[in-house]
């Protein structure tokens, strides 16, 4: 019975993703091709009033949010580990109060008209408390939010 539920879930998900992909305006698809001409395989979804393109680029998972006019409003690159973060962010994190905690994920978030951010998702050492730390690329920690019992998705609700 569980297997049937999983199969049904994935079939419904595929139908939904296919329906979203068919309804993405041409202007938005063209904008993605201008930004990332080499990307071939794209999964489309929606987040509030935005179309979201998900794909692999240079070995990283990426997502780009587009408004209805075809302008990108947010890009996310899933770095997963601290190896890619700017030196200033690494320094602030390493000498900060969360340095002994386990890093679960690291995401670069870029915007066309405001400063980029690096979000470090971590779990406190010897606890089940999870945080998202929001850094500017110059190393300034601008927010530390407890996400233990919250939706941890970095989407339109978080940034737009």
State each model region's role:
Residues 1-24, 32:
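Bacterial Sec-dependent N-terminal signal peptides
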Residues 21-160:
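Interaction-mediating elements
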